[in-house]
């Protein structure tokens, strides 16, 4: 199970644009928790703290223990609104963690893409999916999906059926999809094309 982040929050009872501006003047950010068939909870967070954590890798798949005036909630970030100029967090949506399984988006890490076999032979590594949606056991929530693509040849695609997911996780769709491809650049030949050319020359 991924490391759990501990955050403190305060409940809030005032809503609307004016109330949000007043919170931000105090250095706080409005937020809400919803989902899992529970009553939504409106809260506020310390702006500097939540912005600091947002800027760390894979925040959107970070499991969080959110303490609100003595009561703890296990939540996941769902959506983050940023200031258009400063990139400071302005609003956060969280979802309550489900009882058994959790649907969530996680980033995909393509390990070894710069030195992949197909790239060494002149190909270009093309990322189709930077994030994937998974259904995960709540006791084993991953921060990301890491795929070793070192041996991926040129002119091939990486399909979901070939990806080994973390234990307790599955894709939310059974339909096969492509996560990445290695595209041959002009002048680059696949191994099969090279063999055909050599055969024709005999």
Swiss-Prot record:
GO process annotations (BP): translation
Pfam families attached to this UniProt entry: Ribosomal_L25p, Ribosomal_TL5_C
Keywords per UniProt: Ribonucleoprotein, Ribosomal protein, RNA-binding, rRNA-binding
GO molecular function, a single term: 5S rRNA binding
Organism domain of life: Bacteria
One Gene Ontology CC term in the entry: cytosolic large ribosomal subunit
UniProt cross-references to InterPro entries, sorted A to Z: Rbsml_bL25/Gln-tRNA_synth_N (IPR020056), Ribosomal_bL25/Gln-tRNA_synth (IPR011035), Ribosomal_bL25_b-dom (IPR020057), Ribosomal_bL25_C (IPR037121), Ribosomal_bL25_long (IPR001021), Ribosomal_bL25_short (IPR020055), Ribosomal_L25_dom (IPR029751), Ribosomal_uL5_bac-type (IPR020930)
Subunit field text: Part of the 50S ribosomal subunit; part of the 5S rRNA/L5/L18/L25 subcomplex. Contacts the 5S rRNA. Binds to the 5S rRNA independently of L5 and L18.
UniProt function note: This is one of the proteins that binds to the 5S RNA in the ribosome where it forms part of the central protuberance.
Family: Belongs to the bacterial ribosomal protein bL25 family. CTC subfamily.
UniProt-recorded name of the protein: Large ribosomal subunit protein bL25
Organism whose genome encodes this protein: Rickettsia bellii (strain OSU 85-389)
């Amino acid at each position: 199970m991924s490391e759990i982040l501990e955050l403190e929050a305060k409940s809030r009872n005032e809503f609307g644009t004016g109330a949000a501006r007043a919170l931000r003047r105090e250095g706080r950010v409005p937020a809400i928790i919803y989902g899992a068939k529970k009553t939504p909870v409106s809260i506020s967070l310390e702006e500097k703290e939540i912005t600091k954590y947002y800027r760390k890798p894979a925040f959107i798949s970070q499991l969080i223990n959110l303490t609100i005036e003595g009561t703890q909630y296990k939540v996941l970030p769902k959506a983050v609104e940023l200031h258009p100029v400063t990139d400071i967090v302005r609003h956060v949506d969280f979802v309550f963690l489900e009882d058994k399984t959790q649907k969530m988006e996680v980033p995909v890490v393509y390990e070894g893409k710069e030195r992949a076999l197909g790239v060494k032979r002149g190909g270009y590594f093309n990322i189709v999916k930077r994030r994937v949606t998974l259904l995960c056991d709540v006791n084993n929530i991953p921060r990301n999906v890491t795929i070793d693509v070192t041996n991926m040849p040129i002119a091939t695609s990486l399909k979901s059926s070939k990806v080994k997911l973390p234990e307790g996780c599955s894709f939310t769709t059974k339909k096969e999809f492509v996560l990445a491809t290695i595209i041959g650049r002009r002048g680059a030949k696949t191994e099969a094309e090279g063999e055909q050319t050599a055969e024709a020359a005999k």
